[in-house]
Amino acid sequence: MRGELPDIPDELGAPSFLKRALKAVSPEDGGGFDRLLPHLLEVRLPAQYVGEEFGIVRKDWDTARLRLALGFPDLYTLGMSYLGMQVLYHLVNRPEEATPTRAAAAGGPYLCERVFYPNADMQELMQRYGVPLYALESKRPLRDFDAVGFSFNNEGAYSNLPRMLRLASIPVWQRDRSDDDPIIIGGGECMLNPEPVADFLDAVAVGDGEELILDIAHCLAELRGAPREKRLAGLSHVPGIYIPSFYRPVCDDKGRFARLEPHDDLPPGVYALERITKRLLNDFARWRPPLKPVIPWVDTASGSANLEVMRGCPQRCRFCHAGHVYLPARFLSAESVVNNTLALATNTGSDWVSLQSLSLLDHPEILQILEQLRPELDRSGVNLGIPSLRMDAVSREVAELMRRPKESSLTFAPEAGTQRLRDAVNKRIKADDIASTFEHCARAGWHKFKLYFMVGFPGETDEDVQSIVDLTRELNRIARTHGSRAPRINVSVNALVPKPHTPLQWAPLVHEEDLRRKHSHLRSEFRALGKRVRLSYTSYEEAFVETLLSRGDRRLAQVLALAEERGLVLQGDAELFDFDAWRQCWEEAGLDAEREVHGERSYETSLPWDHIDSLVRKRFLWSEWQHFLRRSPTPSCFEECVHCGLGCEK
């Protein structure tokens, strides 16, 4: 033993995670984790840094054909709630359990480990003792892996990527890496516009990770030991893989993004398409999710075991990024959902199992699922986690079936208070549906609710903003009238952040003075609704930076690099978000952020993500943008095919 285990106060519980970590430390790890171990109780939630959780997969380092680390550019408590990471970890380490036919073709064995963004106190500890960022399973430095894949499910994590690379002693800029450095890959929902972080990445995986990761692993295993240039050339032949260094951005005479084009002097063997097409998991219904996931030591953001029961959403709300990039809607069968839910509850010991989807009540067998799960879960005392629900699909029966032994809340997203604005964003729910849903839920015993609205839509009026207050007041009255307990309603009002590959990608961000005026009006009006109705909202500064990052081009990488050098963060403690310091970064990088965020865009305007084919045609998105401006809704995918480009009608 190379470090003495410190005394642990009784109130922290048994030091099992530290003892397991100490036992697992190998003299060959080369990262110096043993130097950290005696000091881990100096940091907050030390258990998140030791690994050794139940359900991990440990493989032999020396015999693995490929050593892959999955990086989540945010805290462990968030990353361990992210189902995508569990899915990919399970798929690489145990492919035969998830997709036997693909596993045989992909080869192996492959080794896959995890790494998360460390909190500031842990970063300081690592630097004090000279320990680079390491993977949790083997404790080996991240730089020792063949490849590191980062999942981005929100743009706020972008600023953490250069910091993680620096902590790992891996060159931040792709151009500075050598043959000895790992291949850095970006994936996840945000990589439908990878340009803001493209100069940090060697490769980008566009589309469903289950379709891509074994192909990536097989390619890199076959080329292991080859020069970096040859490995990237090999990856360029994998459908859905984009190699940013093979392309160059072209700007117009005013310094604005004009287009992205392949370099003229690409090395032999490179496959550089003008557009990269998203990979799609078509056989989602036959997909085998991880039923023995890694069980975290500490409480996570979701606090539940998670099961994805549906991918995509047929409703196509015009502001919704996930609703467009995950099209078409795909489902697990009722039998699979029920069996997998019960298996997850048994295997994890969790008293919560969350059914994850964008629009759960659009599942064609949802009533059957709830009817079969309710008695089984009641017997075992397990609660069912329900995501945001459509307000025109909750019957009295559904409201009763969703009730759980443990008190919780229901989440709804009306998005707008007036019918004309709901029609504009294609949120096709009527006022009567909203009222009846609340009545059903109150009669079924629900009394805690979360409501999500948005402001800042083009053409929005003061009446639209006031209607948020009026609708909340009416729903509060309904819940008081028909419920057995006084309701508690939390209302969140977010500013519209225009997202790539959505009809509102052409919309500007609301101006600062306009948003502040709307916030002021809402604060004043909500005070009259009482203490049991609470209002929260995102700031203009947060919306500004998110818009800049979500619709940005490669010039954003310099901004992010400057921010990392100055210790700026976008996520975590709101008090640490320094908008003026961020402004200084983009001004120093020569970026006109005001123009990027508030500028007008036409159909002919080149967009930084035009080279990424989401399978939904740009012409269709433009047509939907025109429908938004006319306040005209369009039918859901279930009602009528609108020929968006996916080819579902074939």
Annotated model-derived regions:
Residues L68-D74, Y89-V92, P293-F319, A345, ...:
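N-terminal pre-triad scaffold of radical SAM enzymes
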Residues R2-A198:
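Acidic, glycine-rich segments characteristic of secretory precursors and extracytoplasmic regions
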Residues T101-A106, Y117-M122, M126-P267, P503-D553, ...:
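Glycine-rich beta-alpha loop elements in corrinoid/cobalamin-binding modules
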Residues Y82, V298-E335, H643-K650:
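Canonical Radical SAM [4Fe-4S] cluster-binding loop centered on the CxxxCxxC motif
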Residues M1-V57, A64, L68-L70, T99-A105, ...:
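Radical SAM enzyme core and accessory elements
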Residues G234-S245, L358-H363, P387-V394, G456, ...:
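A glycine-rich phosphate-binding loop feature that marks nucleotide/adenosyl-phosphate handling sites
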Residues G71, T77, G156, L342-K450, ...:
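Conserved SAM/AdoMet-binding glycine-rich loop
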Residues L37-A69, Y76-T77, F257-N306, L615-H627:
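N-terminal [4Fe-4S]-dependent radical SAM core
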